[in-house]
């Protein structure tokens, strides 16, 4: 499914209903007083975080969201009906900005989070309100106020616990497919993953975490090379980064240079992102004899002066992936999510 991480939409709240100009007209009461009712408030537009929604794709086909207007007041002191609020479900992790001012309106993180993005107009008053000792038959009413209207920018950052880093063809898509139910497109050419993928890794019945696979980076991405760094923002809310490294690249490239290229792109994109906990995961160890694979991994560790956690896996054969997933689960449970 194509992933949409940005959308633009116009929201219009309902206008308030006008107040009513009316007088009592009943038999034997020739000069009845004012009985004009108030209008109804206009409906508001709300965004609600819904865990059953996972993209912003619907907003590509529905660019205008409009709540109902309030009904006008009526005689016999009857108020107009309030306009119905418009409740719009959005994915967890949606950030809402005012398109014109870039003002942050709100962030919808947890299921059920509710955000008013356009407030309905207040109702108008009927002529009953303007009766006084000197004016027994007021002909004055007020109009309902216009509802708020604004252009919005919606941005979706994936709410994943673990993010995958790596150059194209490092095996990230194969890894997420091996450990979760995600089914990203997998092939042997750069940029196979053109849109972010989420996978749920379930290590036991009630122990699971979410992992995000984003398009592979290449050196110079921050200058626009390859797919650029536009998808790196999806990793900003993760607690941990897994750096997938191909230790047997078919093009003969140097894994150390590949790792350093990724680190450089991270630092250029965001200092906070570059300082997140990061584990090295050496992939495709099945393509080398065990002693050669061990020696190559150790060489990379030494050249990088790497002090962090290291794992050796074969994603395609699911070798070493179970231990890695259990260790990830333990790390996440020890370090509670804080967004």
Curated annotation (Swiss-Prot):
Which CDD domains does this entry report, sorted A to Z?
Answer: Obg
Pfam families to which the protein is assigned, alphabetical: GTP1_OBG, MMR_HSR1
Compartments it resides in: Cytoplasm
| Documented EC number(s) | 3.6.5.-
- Cofactor(s) annotated in UniProt: Mg(2+)
Top-rank taxon: Bacteria
Q: Which GO terms describe its molecular function?
A: GTP binding; GTPase activity; magnesium ion binding
Its cellular-component GO annotations read: cytoplasm
The protein's matches in InterPro entries, at most eight in alphabetical order, are given as: G_OBG, GTP-bd, GTP-bd_Obg/CgtA, GTP1-OBG_CS, GTP1_OBG_dom, GTP1_OBG_dom_sf, OBG_GTPase, P-loop_NTPase
**Residues annotated as binding GTP:** 166-173, 191-195, 213-216, 283-286, 314-316
Q: Which residues bind Mg(2+)?
A: 173, 193
Where does the OBG-type G domain lie?
160-333
Q: Which GO terms describe its biological process?
A: ribosome biogenesis
What are the alphabetically sorted keywords of the record?
Cytoplasm, GTP-binding, Hydrolase, Magnesium, Metal-binding, Nucleotide-binding
Tell me the enzyme class.
Answer: hydrolase
Q: Taking every annotated instance into account, which residue ranges of this chain make up the domain Obg?
A: 1-159
The UniProt annotation puts the region (Disordered) at 127-147
Biological role: An essential GTPase which binds GTP, GDP and possibly (p)ppGpp with moderate affinity, with high nucleotide exchange rates and a fairly low GTP hydrolysis rate. Plays a role in control of the cell cycle, stress response, ribosome biogenesis and in those bacteria that undergo differentiation, in morphogenesis control.
Q: Which family does it belong to?
A: Belongs to the TRAFAC class OBG-HflX-like GTPase superfamily. OBG GTPase family.
| Assembly | Monomer.
Q: What is this protein called?
A: GTPase Obg
